[in-house]
Structure formats: C-alpha cells, structure tokens
C-alpha cells in the first residue's frame, strides 16, 4: 500500500490473508477441527495462525474446546453431577466426599481406591458414561507385600464436572471443612449420599476371628458427623453412639463416630443398605455377615 507506514501495511495484509483463508479453507477448517485437530496444527498446515483458525470456527458457530476438553480423550457425561436427583448421583456424590478430589486448575476429578475395591471406579465410570481407563499403580517393595500397596485410580477431565461438584460442597482440600450438602441432596436421597460416604470413609470392623461384627465406624469432621446423625435420626430415630477424636495430638476436628451397640449398628446399616441399588460390594458383604451374626445370636 503506497504511502502508508509498515504497521498499517501489515494490518491490511493480515486482513487480506484472512479473507483469502476464509474463502479457501473455511470448510476444511471446520471439518478438521470437528475431527479433533488443534487450531495450531490446522493453521500451520494452511499457512495461517491458530488465532485465525479459532476465529473462523467461532464465526461459523463452532465451539472452541477448553484445555480440559483437549486433555479428555474419552467420552464422558460431564453434567452427571449437575443436579442430584437419583440414588446413583447421591451415592457417588457421597463417595466423592469421602475419597474423591477435584482440581479446578487442572479441571480434573480424581477418585482412587485400593486395588481390591477398584470395582467402585468401574461403577462410577458406568454411571457417568465415561470411557476413561482405570489405571493401577504399584509401589514395589521387593517382597510379597507389593500387592498390598496397589492403588486403582480414575481421572476425569471436565471443567463442568469440577464446577458441579464444587457447587455441591465437594471442594478442594475438603478434609477439615466438610459439611452435609442439605441444599443439594433432597431428603429422600440423603441415605444414599450417606451410604456413599460410608463406603468411602466408614468401616464395619472385623472381630477377633476375622468375621464382621455388628458395629460401624465413620470418620469425618465433628460437624459433618453431627449432621449425618441428624439426618439418620429424622429417618429411623436416635442412634446410640460415641465420638473419639482420631488424632488428638494433631489439634484438628477429624473425629470417629462409633456405633458399637450391635442392635443399633445393624439398624443403622440396614437403613443404609436395604434395597440399595449401588454400593461397595465388600461393605455390603460385611453388612450381611454382621446382620447374620446378630440374628444367629438372637435366634440360635
């Protein structure tokens, strides 16, 4: 352009190249981006910038993927946790409260379990229609104890799922600030949420002979455990219990809720597991065995 400064000439040159790129490559850009190619890769191949490719995609109604979406190589129902309106969603929200984590920076939801309980990760995968792999990580100690240190892990990349979980109280670094999500979980679904939490952070202890005994232990903040007891009492009446501070020397609010009276424990566990459609297989088996133990003692 005669008589103009270099910056102006460069500006008009870019506009002209943009028009030429649109005229020649728009359909190719849309197809290749839809097929999974990045804007930078497409731009390099046609002599354009990734920014121009993004602009063309947006101009034609296309959705520019987030970093989390690019990381995600597997199908996923991102809005599974948007509204907690089914037993399955309430259960897995509780399980995430216990054993899951969210990372807003990496836009990642992570759930890990000891390898024997890896079936829980497969159940969550199925629930949220995910094709992400469950990976097994082993810490080798050079002896027969190696298998005891195997961990199964499921990572789901989704900014929407992270945001939904945070909106329901499943926040980063939640250990010392967990509270019951009354606003998110409707009353009829609250026992399923508690069962999910119990399957993650509760236990049915074994007796001296290695058999499940009718008792239950739940770990959490004192405030959260009080709220669990309040929900339980409104459904089946007061439950006899005791509290034990887990590590008093650490000066924090992590507490153990003990339901040690056998009949009370079975009543609590029956409320959690009766007619349940989603649960940890190992915990369900222990509940059945402990209930049978009490039944045999009452009716030999």
Tell what function each PLM region has.
Residues 5-300:
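Internal intein/HINT superfamily modules and their associated LAGLIDADG
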């Amino acid at each position: 352009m005669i008589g103009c400064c270099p910056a102006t000439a460069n500006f008009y040159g870019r506009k002209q190249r943009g028009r030429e790129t649109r005229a020649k490559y728009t359909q190719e850009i849309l197809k290749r981006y839809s097929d999974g190619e990045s804007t930078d890769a497409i731009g390099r191949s046609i002599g354009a910038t990734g920014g121009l490719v993004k602009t063309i995609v947006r101009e034609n109604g296309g959705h520019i993927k987030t970093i989390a979406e690019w990381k995600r190589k597997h199908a996923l129902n991102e809005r599974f946790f948007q509204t907690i309106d089914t037993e399955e969603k309430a259960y897995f929200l509780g399980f995430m409260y216990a054993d899951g984590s969210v990372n807003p920076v990496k836009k990642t939801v992570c759930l890990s379990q000891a390898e024997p309980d890896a079936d829980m990760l497969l159940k969550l995968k199925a629930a949220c229609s995910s094709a992400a792999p469950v990976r097994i990580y082993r810490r080798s100690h050079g002896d027969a104890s190696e298998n005891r240190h195997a961990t199964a892990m499921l990572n789901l990349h989704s900014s929407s799922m992270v945001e939904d979980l945070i909106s329901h109280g499943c926040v980063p670094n939640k250990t010392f600030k967990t509270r019951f999500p009354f606003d998110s979980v409707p009353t009829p679904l609250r026992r399923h949420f508690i069962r999910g939490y119990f399957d993650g952070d509760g236990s049915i202890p074994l007796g001296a002979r290695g058999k499940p005994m009718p008792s239950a232990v739940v770990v959490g903040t004192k405030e959260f455990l009080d709220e669990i007891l309040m929900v339980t009492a409104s459904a089946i009446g007061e439950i006899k219990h005791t509290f034990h501070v887990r590590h008093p020397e650490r000066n924090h609010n992590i507490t153990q809720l003990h339901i040690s009276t056998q009949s009370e424990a079975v009543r609590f566990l029956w409320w959690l597991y009766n007619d349940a459609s989603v649960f940890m297989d190992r915990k369900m088996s222990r509940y059945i065995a402990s209930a049978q133990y009490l039944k045999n003692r009452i009716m030999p």
